[in-house]
């Protein structure tokens, strides 16, 4: 029985902070060695941090990575343990994303990434080149200062594996796990038993199962041990790397790390039986047949043993049940951890949130409350780094530290209700109640006097005073009056964030939190430079439907019972006067429901639909419920306001990335911001399709469709994408 103890890790790295990154790498190696591991793998580009972006183009970045590696090699950290360490390497003036394998203070091999990630949030081709030479390993000339430490002039560089006396090992890097022609296939057929994967994979709602299933299926098809490492935390941008380091053997997960955590270092180890891998493969006739005429892969021979001799009491680690968080938990824990990293690394003293009492701002408040709960829990569990950060941020003195989440929230979280004559008592009381449950320092600030002062100034300048629509004003006046209130709140929020610490004799500044959701961004249902303009936004990529589910969950599990009332209230901006016969509602203003918006967003981004293909898709999905002309009106209405408001996305607050149909303009959803909002060609094609469908007479309401329409039943067909949009607002409405 060949037994091998292996270790993987989650590391909370910070792009370009080499001190922090090096410290975490060293700590993870030390913990792996203490556990008796013979192999340790860390995250992708762990020495620099994955999110360096254009800093990768600087020679300094690669040079500093080599300096950090020299520190590791000269410090004896790799003595007795094979370490896979991620860093950028420049070879013949070309930059590669590499795993450097080190053992006993020497470099065994450098393995460049062969399949780069270049979609969604990833832009690896901007900074790196893929290694395309698979026939042979080449010699890499080491930097002189590294040669002095390792006593090596050159080391093998390229695609291949490492053959030890008792085990063969190779690597895949992040994206290569998901490619159609994955490296592990040829490697497994060449006898490689252990695969290490250094990853820089970010969180997205409902995404973890894809990652876990890929590892399971990889080792189920080919057999083997798969070690997966990942970053965890905010390393300086919109992404939260969600850890979940794990180890899989022959299709079973035998160890799984946390997906969301405040820890800087988490190490996971397992004792694996390599003979079980050999036995598994030998039992599959198709594997034996394919291995007999395999494509040979180059390798490096290392005369060293990694396995432990069998002793009584040594039992291979058995399978575990994989832990998946519910989407509501993902919304709670992912943004909470992201906010904590941002807070401690920005050196801010806390957060300020304009709390309106509505679903969006209440969700953000609950997330901050959840963050405070996580901090106190980790302190109770003995995390000294979290404790030190919390003491500094909360400005505790004389050895005091946070022991209660509400007390911590009082120190680092301001909430402000900025009401006007258009605000209701319901939202005011809900905001106050939630603030009390969380423990924030809450202020109720009326802003009518500021609004009145601006309107008086405008009247002196122009001789005119705008009126609300309910008072006989035009749409232009009505929108202008709403925007004044919204923008005053933004200015006041930033003023209070900078000055309230001074008022309370505290040092530092507060970060302003935004609370617009992904659907409002997609539709443009927000005022440019209102409270959607903030320092950061933890829910900017979360849908309204998911937020409402989160509110229901948080009311129970975070013990903020007032959130149940918040969730039950209809969404409203409260920017227009309330009358007996009129109450402003979001979905009426937008001319579409949030549910419809979610569908439009998924079709536009995930399924890459333009106006015509979206119309065709929705005609199929809403067959028997809406006529072709009704579907056409809805599609045109969406694309009209999407185009008109697209410019707002260019200045939207940096938001936590959570949703696959996010319209975030920075890198995820790159589009122009000046459109012909009439879409003349596309809309004409839709009109032609409607005429053809009406002419053919084939659009017949089915009995099933009629029943759905009468009952308002939502269709689950099409992977949950079909929805019966019964009772949606007038498509000609909107602002």
Swiss-Prot record:
It catalyses: deamido-NAD(+) + L-glutamine + ATP + H2O = L-glutamate + AMP + diphosphate + NAD(+) + H(+). This is Glutamine-dependent NAD(+) synthetase. It comes from Oryza sativa subsp. indica (Rice). InterPro entries: C-N_Hydrolase, C-N_Hydrolase_sf, Gln-dep_NAD_synthase, NAD/GMP_synthase, NAD_synthase, Rossmann-like_a/b/a_fold. Keywords: ATP-binding, Ligase, NAD, Nucleotide-binding. GO terms for molecular function: ATP binding; glutaminase activity; NAD+ synthase (glutamine-hydrolyzing) activity. Pathway: Cofactor biosynthesis; NAD(+) biosynthesis; NAD(+) from deamido-NAD(+) (L-Gln route): step 1/1. One of its GO terms (biological process) is NAD biosynthetic process. Pfam families: CN_hydrolase (PF00795), NAD_synthase (PF02540).
């Amino acid at each position: 029985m060949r037994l091998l103890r292996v270790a993987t890790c989650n590391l909370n790295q910070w792009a370009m902070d080499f001190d922090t990154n090096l410290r975490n790498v060293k700590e993870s190696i030390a913990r792996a060695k203490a556990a008796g591991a013979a192999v340790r793998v860390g995250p992708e580009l762990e020495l620099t941090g994955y999110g360096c972006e254009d800093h990768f183009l600087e020679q300094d970045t690669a040079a500093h990575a080599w300096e950090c590696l020299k520190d590791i090699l000269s410090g004896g950290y790799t003595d007795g343990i094979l370490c896979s360490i991620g860093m950028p390497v420049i070879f013949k003036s070309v930059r590669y994303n590499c795993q450097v394998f080190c053992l006993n203070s020497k470099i065994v091999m450098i393995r460049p990434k062969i399949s780069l990630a270049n979609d969604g949030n990833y832009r690896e081709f901007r900074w790196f080149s893929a290694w395309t030479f698979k026939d042979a390993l080449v010699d890499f000339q080491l930097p002189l200062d590294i040669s002095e430490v390792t006593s090596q002039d050159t080391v093998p560089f390229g695609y291949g594996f490492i053959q030890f006396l008792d085990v063969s090992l190779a690597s895949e890097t992040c994206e290569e796990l998901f490619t159609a022609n994955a490296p592990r296939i040829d490697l497994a057929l060449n006898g490689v038993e252990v695969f290490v994967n250094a990853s820089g994979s970010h969180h997205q709602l409902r995404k973890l199962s894809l990652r876990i299933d890929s590892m399971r299926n990889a080792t189920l098809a080919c057999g083997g041990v798969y070690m997966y490492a990942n970053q965890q935390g905010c390393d300086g941008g919109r992404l939260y790397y969600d850890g979940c380091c794990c180890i899989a053997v022959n299709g079973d997960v035998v160890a799984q790390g946390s997906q969301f955590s405040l820890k800087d270092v988490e190490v996971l180890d397992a004792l694996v039986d390599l003979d079980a891998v050999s036995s598994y493969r030998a039992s599959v006739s198709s594997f034996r047949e394919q291995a007999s005429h395999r494509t040979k892969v180059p390798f490096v021979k290392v005369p060293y043993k990694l396995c432990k001799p069998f002793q009584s009491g040594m039992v291979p680690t058995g399978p575990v049940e994989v832990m998946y968080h519910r989407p509501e938990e993902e919304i709670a824990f992912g943004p909470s951890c992201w906010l904590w990293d941002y807070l401690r690394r920005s050196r801010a003293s806390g957060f300020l949130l304009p709390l309106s009492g509505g679903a969006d701002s209440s969700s953000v408040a609950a997330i901050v409350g959840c963050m405070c709960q996580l901090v106190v829990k980790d302190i109770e569990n003995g995390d000294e780094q979290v404790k030190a950060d919390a003491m500094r941020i909360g400005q505790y003195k004389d050895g005091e530290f946070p022991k209660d989440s509400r007390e911590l929230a009082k120190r680092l979280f301001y909430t402000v209700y900025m009401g006007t004559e258009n605000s209701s008592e319901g939202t005011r009381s809900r905001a106050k109640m939630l603030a009390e449950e969380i423990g924030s320092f809450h202020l109720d600030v009326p802003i009518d006097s500021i609004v009145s002062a601006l309107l008086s100034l405008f009247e002196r300048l122009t001789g005119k005073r705008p009126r609300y629509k309910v008072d006989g004003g035009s749409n232009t006046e009505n929108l202008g009056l709403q925007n004044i209130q919204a923008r005053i709140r933004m200015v006041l929020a930033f003023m209070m964030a900078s000055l309230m610490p001074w008022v309370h004799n505290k040092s530092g500044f507060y970060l302003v939190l935004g609370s617009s959701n992904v659907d409002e961004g997609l539709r443009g249902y927000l005022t440019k430079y209102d409270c959607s303009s903030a320092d950061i936004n933890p829910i900017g990529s979360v849908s309204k439907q998911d937020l409402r589910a989160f509110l229901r969950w948080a009311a129970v599990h975070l013990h903020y019972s007032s959130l149940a009332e918040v969730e039950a209230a209809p969404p409203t901006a409260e920017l227009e006067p309330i009358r007996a016969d009129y109450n402003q509602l979001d979905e009426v203003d937008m001319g579409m429901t949030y549910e419809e918006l979610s569908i439009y967003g998924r079709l536009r981004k995930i399924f890459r639909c333009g106006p015509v293909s979206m119309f065709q898709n929705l005609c199929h999905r809403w067959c028997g419920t809406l006529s072709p002309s009704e579907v056409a009106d809805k599609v045109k209405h969406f694309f009209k306001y999407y185009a008109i408001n697209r410019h707002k996305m260019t200045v939207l607050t940096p938001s936590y990335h959570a949703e696959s149909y996010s319209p975030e303009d920075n890198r995820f959803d790159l589009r122009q911001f000046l459109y012909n909002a009439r879409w003349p060609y596309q809309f004409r094609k839709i009109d032609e399709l409607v005429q053809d469908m009406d002419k053919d007479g084939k659009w017949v309401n089915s009995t099933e469709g009629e029943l759905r329409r009468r009952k308002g039943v939502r269709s689950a067909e099409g992977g949950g994408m079909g929805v019966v949009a019964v009772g949606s607002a007038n498509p000609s409405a909107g602002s």
